[in-house]
């Protein structure tokens, strides 16, 4: 989310309030104007009773990372190495999870899932501690390999995570939301 919000963070006097919640609950709060925007991994469903609008922000390929100690456990090339180490995955609530599972099937991978996480930052923290290898978007690469010292296992261009800003207005009026949308 940080990458998506960067265009709005150069605003003087900015006060961000970022909340997490169930997708449907966030959309309901948005429709009631309790929120200015919802950042999501999927567009809002078509619902005549819910006046919200999805704006595509972009997409990013997934890359797989592991701690150096975990990577040392396997000499197999990517993606076969994923079968030889525990994995940490987004929970099934994340839209990308179904695409990851489909990719495992296409590659005939049967990995051991050591943990499932709603929060990608928490997932990366446990990955950094060596609990398992994990996917993250290419936007996180420099932070994960530089600041956190993780090793890149491989790039997975076949699995892409999509990002949307969902608003309660078709033509967004809020100036910070306009910045996020690149307007």
Question: Where are each of the predicted segments found?
Answer:
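Central regulatory/effector-binding core of bacterial HTH transcription factors
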Residues: 1-46, 117
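Residues at or immediately flanking beta-strands
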Residues: 13-17, 110-114, 162-164
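Generic preference for hydrophobic
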Residues: 18, 37-39, 54, 64-65, ...
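Active-site-adjacent beta-strand anchor residues
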Residues: 19-20, 89-90, 116, 134, ...
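Hydrophobic hinge/microswitch elements
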Residues: 22-26, 31-34, 41, 95-151
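Flexible hinge/capping segments at coil-to-helix
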Residues: 51-92
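Short beta-strand->loop
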Residues: 52-63, 146-160
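A late-sequence structural motif
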Residues: 73, 151-183
């Amino acid at each position: 989310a940080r990458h998506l919000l960067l265009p709005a963070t150069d605003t003087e006097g900015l006060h961000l309030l970022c909340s997490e919640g169930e997708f449907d609950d966030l959309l309901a709060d948005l429709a009631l104007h309790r929120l200015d925007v919802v950042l999501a991994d999927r567009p809002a469903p078509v619902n005549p009773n819910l006046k919200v609008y999805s704006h595509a922000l972009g997409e990013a390929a997934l890359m797989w990372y592991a701690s150096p100690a975990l990577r040392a456990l396997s000499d197999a090339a990517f993606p076969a190495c994923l079968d030889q180490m525990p994995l940490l995955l987004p929970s099934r609530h994340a839209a990308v999870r179904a695409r990851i599972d489909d990719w495992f099937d296409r590659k005939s991978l049967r990995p051991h899932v050591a943990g499932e996480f709603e929060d990608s930052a928490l997932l990366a923290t446990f990955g950094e501690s060596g609990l398992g290898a994990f996917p993250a978007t290419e936007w996180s690469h420099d932070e994960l390999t530089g600041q956190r010292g993780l090793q890149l296992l491989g790039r997975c261009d076949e699995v892409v995570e999509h990002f949307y800003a969902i608003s309660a207005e078709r033509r967004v009026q809020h100036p910070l939301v306009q910045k996020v949308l690149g307007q």
